[in-house]
Amino acid sequence: MTAHASIATPGGISLATGRDVRLASRSGALTGSTAGFAPGFVQANLAILPAKLAFDFLRFCQRNPKPCPVIGVSEPGDPTLSSIGLDLDIRTDVPGYCVYKDGVLVDEPADLKAYWREDLVTFAIGCSLSFEEALMAADIPLRHVEKGVKVPMFRTNIACVPAGPFAGPMVVSMRPMTPANAIRAVQITSRFPSVHGAPIHIGLPEAIGIKDLSKPDYGDAVEILEGEIPVFWACGVTPQSVISAAKIEYALAHGPGMMLCTDLKNSALATG
Amino acid sequence: MTAHASIATPGGISLATGRDVRLASRSGALTGSTAGFAPGFVQANLAILPAKLAFDFLRFCQRNPKPCPVIGVSEPGDPTLSSIGLDLDIRTDVPGYCVYKDGVLVDEPADLKAYWREDLVTFAIGCSLSFEEALMAADIPLRHVEKGVKVPMFRTNIACVPAGPFAGPMVVSMRPMTPANAIRAVQITSRFPSVHGAPIHIGLPEAIGIKDLSKPDYGDAVEILEGEIPVFWACGVTPQSVISAAKIEYALAHGPGMMLCTDLKNSALATG
């Protein structure tokens, strides 16, 4: 992933580890996407919600583990999350954030200092960057990475199992592959249930309500070549989509592509 | 597992499926252990807690997935759990229950009709019977099954990651195996992260605070033969032990060995 070689960072700053990226985000040195940085370290989606909704949301995640694989949950009001990052401060350690009120995006601040509340709970949710690293290590090409664009994502007709106010369709990401690579990708990603796990669908987009693969709902379209089939994974955009649809009075999230870089290693997530 | 062939059930009653066992429990026809019944179906540990503690407990489980693999969570006050069992009624569908007040066992009723409250949340937690079935299918002998006794369980010096009032040591189960079978057992149980997953320790009991394998804290001792090593899995007794230690004002659970039999198939839990 070389798409972000152009991101301006002060000369000599290291972005080799999750903590490096967090500190660079905290200092303001890193303001864009985290893709390609902290190789080997788990990057996570963020959902930050009032404590009164925390059990509903965690129950939603338990019921929908493929789109919503939880890798860390904070204590209510506590901006640290030491189980996944040394001296992590969730208010500053991501390059940028989104602030939602009643489901509407109202601000995209560089930090959450003005938006933090004593009743907030942070959920860190696994992200496909972890399994993409394992796929690339197995020499499975990923077209969106090769082209330097965002992975194409689609809303499906697969309903998530609801919990409290949280409900809605599963969002999936799509990667075109040769059949042989698709089979190998099933094997590899099955070892990573805490970062979306095995594909949820393969080969027949219309069967999950996707009419046109050239028109993704999020991200960028990629070409499907002769002899390739589309492979679909549950996507971490699902919880964001569900939180927005629920018109939660107050919710915070990471900015697009600006993930929380943790101290966990992708390799440590493999179950077998 | 033939240990329960002697359990008295009315002539002709089938205990072949999870629902069969639930209905037999509901009617009072089945009053003992569920081991050996509903082969192929997931059996679960139960923890039933007041809603005000539900987020703390679910967060505890998220932080300790090996001893506390959650397979279902109810809506507050709702005695059904349709995601894991058709027309399941948690108040009646287990052969027997335990009632704890302030951490003390105060009753062992046959049903929860007199103990149900509108603020209770049910947690169904995976159980080693699921992975034991996979081990036996691979011709790996399990001594406690051969001997018709309970698996030996030990408190360790491994601290669970706390959440709210829930804290305490991990409890493990032990199965002696030849080294070749131990390796195969790691492979097989790694595929089942939602029912405790891979072993948490192998070979050196003193390293996890176990002084004497002949004196389990729960269950029955089993012999370790020449050429065998002890293999340890995180155990679903851990959440019970933690709930009891937290002296929760009101908590319900299944009776020993009397599990909630679900409609889920063990084979469906495999991640790869």
UniProtKB/Swiss-Prot annotation, chains A, B:
The reply to whether Hydrolase figures as a keyword in the UniProt entry is no
Q: Which residues form the signal peptide?
A: none
Q: Which domain of life is it from?
A: Bacteria
Q: What is its EC number?
A: 4.2.1.-
Any GO molecular function: lyase activity
Cited Gene3D superfamilies: PSTPO5379-like, PSTPO5379-like domain
Keywords carried by this UniProt record: Lyase
InterPro entries xref list: D-Glu_cyclase, Putative_hydro-lyase, UPF0317
Question: Could you tell me which Pfam families the record lists for this protein?
Answer: D-Glu_cyclase (PF07286)
First-level EC class: lyase
Task: Show the HAMAP family listed in the entry.
Answer: Hydro_lyase
Q: Which family does it belong to?
A: Belongs to the D-glutamate cyclase family.
The name this protein carries in UniProt is Putative hydro-lyase AZC_4080
Species of origin reads Azorhizobium caulinodans (strain ATCC 43989 / DSM 5975 / JCM 20966 / LMG 6465 / NBRC 14845 / NCIMB 13405 / ORS 571)
Give the taxonomic lineage as stored in the record: Bacteria, Pseudomonadati, Pseudomonadota, Alphaproteobacteria, Hyphomicrobiales
